[in-house]
Amino acid sequence: MKIRVGFGFDVHQLVEGRELWLGGIRLEHSKGLLGHSDADVLLHTVCDALLGAANMRDIGYHFPDTAGEYKNIDSKILLKKTVELIATKGYRVGNIDATICAERPKLKAHIPLMQETMAAVMGIDAEDISIKATTTEKLGFTGREEGISAYATVLIEKD
């Protein structure tokens, strides 16, 4: 069996007038994330980590923000396409370990649904997806609630 590890990072600005999508679910919040797609920072981070693990560049290469077809796209579609892309090289998702960094909204109660949603999109077990939420103790842009960032480490494998 061959295994590879990938790392992803993404950040999006919080703005008024947009819905907040994280981990494939819509959250009630006064602001949403700015981006060409639905700006789901967690799913984008996981896509980048998966693509990096398979040595297939990054999310911007495969789904450029200059392409009209990706305007306001549901990031679950991008995640599904990413899993399909790594499958062309014989890889499948082993596990995911991700961290969301945001002051608000508080995310703990939403994590199980994020795990279930992401697992359904990728065709893996929810127990293979770890999602943690933290703050920066009011420091930096996330601490000032100007944006949300996310980090992910993934393991992909093939026989």
UniProtKB/Swiss-Prot annotation:
Chain residues that bind a divalent metal cation: D10, H12, H44
Reaction(s) catalysed by this chain, per the record, are:
4-CDP-2-C-methyl-D-erythritol 2-phosphate = 2-C-methyl-D-erythritol 2,4-cyclic diphosphate + CMP
State where 4-CDP-2-C-methyl-D-erythritol 2-phosphate binds. Answer: D10, V11, H12, H36, S37, D58, I59, G60, T134, T135, T136, E137, F141, R144
Keyword Ribonucleoprotein in annotation = no
Q: What biological process terms from GO does the record include?
A: isopentenyl diphosphate biosynthetic process, methylerythritol 4-phosphate pathway; terpenoid biosynthetic process
- Tell me one Pfam family matched here: YgbB
Report keywords, A-Z: Isoprene biosynthesis, Lyase, Metal-binding
Q: What is its EC number?
A: 4.6.1.12
Q: Which family does it belong to?
A: Belongs to the IspF family.
**Quaternary structure, from the entry:** Homotrimer.
Protein name per UniProt:
2-C-methyl-D-erythritol 2,4-cyclodiphosphate synthase
